[in-house]
């Protein structure tokens, strides 16, 4: 399955949600699965982004649906990047 990097920045509402219910992060990951994608790994980060997630989805349409659904909630802003395995990238050159 294609791999995507999902970079997340919490809004003030999202910060309050995570502070009051840290387990909400795992709940959202399960919701991502219900939308057809899988969170394979996830980190909390310092700096511009609050979270970096490695997500697998069957196609860009599914990933777009995930990004739109999560973004529409107003608790975080998302930047999603398709990731090409380095061997595939080298072979394409």
What are these regions (language model features)?
Residues 5-9, 43-66:
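Short, well-ordered beta-strand segments in beta-rich or mixed alpha/beta enzyme
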């Amino acid at each position: 399955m294609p791999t995507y990097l999902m970079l997340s920045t919490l809004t003030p509402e999202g910060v309050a949600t995570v502070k009051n219910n840290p387990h909400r992060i795992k709940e959202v990951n399960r919701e991502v699965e219900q939308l057809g994608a899988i969170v394979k790994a996830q980190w909390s980060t310092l700096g511009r982004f609050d979270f970096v997630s490695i997500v697998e989805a069957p196609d860009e349409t599914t990933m777009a649906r995930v990004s739109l659904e999560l973004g529409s909630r107003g608790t975080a802003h998302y930047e999603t990047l398709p990731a090409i395995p380095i061997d595939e990238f080298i072979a394409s050159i």
